[in-house]
Curated annotation (Swiss-Prot):
Belongs to the CbiX family. CbiXS subfamily. Homotetramer; dimer of dimers. Substrate binds at residues 43, 68-73. The active site is at residue 9. It comes from the Archaea. InterPro entries: CbiX-like, SiroHydchlorin_Cochelatase, Sirohydro_Cobaltochel/CbiX. GO terms for biological process: anaerobic cobalamin biosynthetic process. The keyword Thylakoid does not apply. The lineage of its organism: Archaea, Thermoproteota, Thermoprotei, Sulfolobales, Sulfolobaceae. The gene is cbiX. Pathway: Cofactor biosynthesis; adenosylcobalamin biosynthesis; cob(II)yrinate a,c-diamide from sirohydrochlorin (anaerobic route): step 1/10. Keywords: Cobalamin biosynthesis, Cobalt, Lyase, Metal-binding. This is Sirohydrochlorin cobaltochelatase.
Length: 128
């Protein structure tokens, strides 16, 4: 069964968790098993979120980093926190082999660009 794991950076500001909750709720319309976890500062951690998916029966996990570009978090921290060694895409969980695939960062996307235009216009109209 497919599990989706959203990865957020995390912040000392508690409201960051609301973003994870909203994106998880949105993706739950399309996928049965969706969890989110943070790289730092907030809970659930990536490890906790992964454990939740596995406990619910996921045996294939697509990890979706809510990051704009590749960097240390993408290349080193996410795999390490998920227990992935090197180029391996599998972990062991309670005697079972679990496949984990990490999606590319968001990068450039015109739909995200449209959101940025909307934010600029909203902010401008609110303040001028």
């Amino acid at each position: 069964m497919l599990g989706v794991l959203l990865v957020l950076h995390g912040s000392k500001i508690p409201e960051w968790k609301d973003v994870g909750i909203k994106y998880a709720e949105y993706l739950s319309r399309y996928f049965n098993l969706v969890e989110f976890g943070f790289l730092e500062f907030n809970k659930p951690t990536l490890s906790e979120a992964l454990s939740n998916l596995l406990a619910k029966g996921a045996n294939k996990i697509v990890v979706v980093p809510l990051l704009f570009a590749t960097g240390t978090h993408f290349k080193r921290d996410i795999p390490r926190l998920l227990g992935i060694d090197g180029d391996e895409k599998k972990i062991q969980y309670m005697g079972k082999e679990i496949e984990i695939i990490i999606a590319d960062p968001l990068g450039f996307d015109e739909k995200i660009g449209e959101v940025l235009v909307k934010r600029v216009n909203e902010t401008y109209n609110k303040n001028y």
